[in-house]
């Protein structure tokens, strides 16, 4: 059966210069996000901080789990604040919230509050980032869908996720200087626990506020007519019907859930296991982990962006998932310092987080992009249970058992996507 014709190249009303500005803003936004990645990527830093406070593996996995559970909020925002004129405010205010809770973690450590209180604040940090990042990311996808043509989206993703991770490498080197006595960059700040975490969170908070300037610089084309309450209700109902009945959206969401569960939720256990493999007394290699994670992501980001311009959205889903499978095989088979390469492979594979929303956005009409990406986030919120599951498996049967579980989930996802997803999806109303 032949596949539908993909969207045309002129599906954006903005001029090439305005689209280039949006691509630049999108890339700049992600550069700052990546620069603060040791804090904004809820997982490794949070898990190791809670572990050093004396918590179990399950508690150490809670920030990542709570982050996932609370990513459903964007659905309500997309339903009740659908107007394109609200896109910029919906970028700015979540950034203010993220900066505030990040400062709160630094203050809790500075004031030498009890480990229990700091644990609660760190878990709350994961919760606030879960709600705020969910709104940010769904809004960004609508901005990109409205402000950049389909034919140029590969360039936007290539620049954002090729150049952006280089900034994460800088952030990781800074973290390594804070946490290790023999960092890669040759400079150590000599910070002991918990001052190293204090400086890390305190430095990230003001950088997050700079992102608001970029958020205000996007050019967003506004439709001539805003939907009325009644028409919006019909759009919501129709959008829900499409999301749960239209094949590219349904199987795209299922694939996303499986890949997220197998390739991202396991990351905390992979990091915790590094201490045993490397015989570390503390998480001194965490900066190296992050550097490799984002260094590989930068190389993969440029290559994958180019690959998207030459192939199709489905190829990107299979490619990123395959990279994650290779990463988990590395975790299971390699010991010693070479074990750290697994963070690079898994980091490169993490770009599934860009190409699954792209697949969903390509399958959606412009008015439904934010809602459909929000529904995808709702599906992703259940990944939090995978984080807790991996923690429980680790506590009972050991971390190796959790790694085998994650690898099996990824392989199942690849088989499903290869069999069920069309290569070039189009919105339901264009078929």
Label every model-predicted segment.
Residues 4-73, 78, 248-290:
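Helix-loop boundary and gating motifs at the non-cytosolic
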Residues 73-87, 179, 299-313, 394-395:
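Helix-to-loop junctions at the C-terminal end of transmembrane segments
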Residues 31, 101, 116-136, 338-352:
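Hydrophobic core of transmembrane alpha-helices in multi-pass small-molecule transporters
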Residues 3-20, 221-253, 431:
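Juxtamembrane intracellular "pre-TM" segments in multi-pass secondary transporters
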Residues 89-105, 315-330, 407:
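Structural signature of the two symmetry-related core transmembrane helices
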Residues 314-353:
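C-terminal transmembrane helical hairpin of 12-TM major facilitator-type secondary transporters
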Residues 57, 150-159, 283-284, 364-377:
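Loop-to-transmembrane helix entry/capping segments in MFS-fold secondary transporters
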Residues 134-148, 351-365:
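Intracellular juxtamembrane helix-capping segments at the cytosolic ends
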């Amino acid at each position: 059966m032949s596949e539908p014709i993909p969207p045309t190249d002129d599906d954006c009303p903005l001029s090439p210069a305005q689209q280039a500005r949006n691509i630049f803003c999108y890339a700049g936004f992600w550069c700052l996000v990546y620069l603060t990645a040791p804090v904004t990527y809820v997982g490794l830093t949070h898990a190791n901080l809670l572990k050093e406070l004396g918590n179990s593996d399950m508690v150490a996995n809670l920030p990542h789990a709570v982050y996932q559970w609370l990513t459903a909020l964007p659905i309500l925002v997309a339903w009740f604040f659908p107007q394109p004129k609200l896109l910029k405010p919906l970028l700015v205010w979540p950034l203010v919230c993220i900066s505030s809770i990040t400062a709160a973690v630094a203050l809790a450590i500075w004031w030498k509050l009890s480990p229990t209180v700091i644990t609660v604040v760190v878990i709350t940090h994961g919760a606030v980032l879960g709600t705020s990042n969910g709104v940010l990311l769904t809004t960004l996808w609508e901005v990109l869908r409205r402000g950049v043509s389909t034919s140029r989206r590969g360039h936007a993703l290539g620049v954002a996720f090729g150049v952006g991770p280089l900034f994460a490498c800088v952030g990781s080197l800074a973290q390594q200087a804070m946490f290790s006595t023999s960092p890669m960059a040759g400079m150590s700040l000599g910070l002991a626990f918990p001052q190293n975490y204090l400086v890390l969170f305190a430095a990230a908070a003001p950088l997050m506020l700079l992102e608001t300037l970029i958020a205000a610089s996007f050019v967003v084309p506004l439709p001539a007519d805003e939907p009325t309450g009644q028409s919006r209700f019909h759009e919501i109902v129709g959008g829900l019907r499409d999301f749960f009945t239209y094949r590219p959206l349904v199987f795209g969401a299922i694939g996303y859930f499986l890949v997220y569960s197998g390739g991202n939720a396991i990351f905390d256990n992979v990091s915790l296991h590094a201490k045993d493999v490397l015989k570390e007394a503390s998480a001194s290699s965490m900066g190296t982990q992050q550097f490799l994670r984002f260094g590989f992501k930068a190389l993969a980001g440029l290559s994958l962006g180019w690959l998207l311009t030459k192939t199709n959205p489905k190829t990107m889903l299979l490619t990123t998932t395959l990279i994650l499978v290779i990463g988990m095989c590395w975790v299971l088979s390699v010991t010693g310092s070479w074990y750290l390469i697994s963070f690079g492979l898994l980091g490169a594979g993490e770009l599934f987080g860009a190409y699954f929303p792209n697949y969903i956005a390509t399958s959606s009409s412009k008015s439904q992009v934010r809602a459909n990406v929000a529904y995808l986030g709702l599906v992703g919120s259940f990944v939090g249970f995978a984080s807790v599951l991996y923690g429980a498996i680790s506590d009972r049967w050991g971390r190796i058992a959790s790694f085998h579980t994650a690898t099996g989930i990824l392989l199942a996802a690849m088989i499903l996507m290869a069999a069920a997803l069309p290569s070039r999806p189009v919105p339901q109303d264009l078929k």
